[in-house]
């Protein structure tokens, strides 16, 4: 009886594996949605659209990018989390829904640890940007100005609980300053208001900030990185002025819980192949983006878990309590 049970179980496992392989062989057979958790125009959105175009070519079906910003990425994350795990609804996310929100909100409509990471696409360093006529030329001068003008400056973020918001909170905590927080739903509207002078400063991706900096429409004062960047050699890091702040805005492709491993593997291979394409690499390099290709699902999952732990430490260090 025991031997018969083992045979039955083994046969079931083999049949399930064969079915998964067959499903992956015919995948995709219809259009695939990629839900982006931020508004159009930012680094996460741009990288996703570049990869989606290559996936269409390699897998033979449309990969439709759909922006669902709001609630620090939770709106888009919920759409994917509750979707069928069949490979036709994917999430391209910033750190917020997968690594940050659980530390800021007592109740979420999804389990951040329940997603199935497929691949890391990109990492974009964050930088401190001020409007072009802000009364400070260096980060030291900016901090000195903030200290004698408490509550008079405004800082924009991509929403409550996003990397840009938490980085700004850490800056205030470490310097003993205060600013008015102005949350947005994405990077593009922040850029518009920084250029127009409606907000004073922000932490955003260097890919967006460098364009404004080079055009004289805004100024990068410091890098939220561990070391200086080759393409901005004259811009200091916050660590150089005694502020140990280092944050990236990364972009991961994930699937709903329990998606078949064979489909995960097929998508992982296709995403990595897309990131190896010379035109994609050049475009991402021009956008000052660190390419995250040639990583497997297990590596992506490990990266997200490490980020989740580190962001939890940052939230606690910032003195923020779950709401």
Per-region residue spans from a language model:
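N-terminal (or domain-start) structured segment
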Residues: 21-113, 152, 173-203, 212, ...
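Short beta-strand->loop
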Residues: 111-120, 156, 178-182, 200, ...
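Short secondary-structure boundary segments
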Residues: 94-95, 132, 206-207, 225-226, ...
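Hinge/capping helix and adjacent helix->loop/strand transition within the periplasmic-binding protein
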Residues: 82-88, 103-189, 238, 243, ...
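Extracytoplasmic/secreted proteins, especially bacterial periplasmic and envelope-associated proteins
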Residues: 46, 50, 54, 75, ...
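An extracytoplasmic/periplasmic, membrane-proximal ligand-sensing/linker region
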Residues: 29-31, 173, 261-323
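Short, low-complexity disordered leader/linker segments with a strong preference
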Residues: 1-29, 140, 323
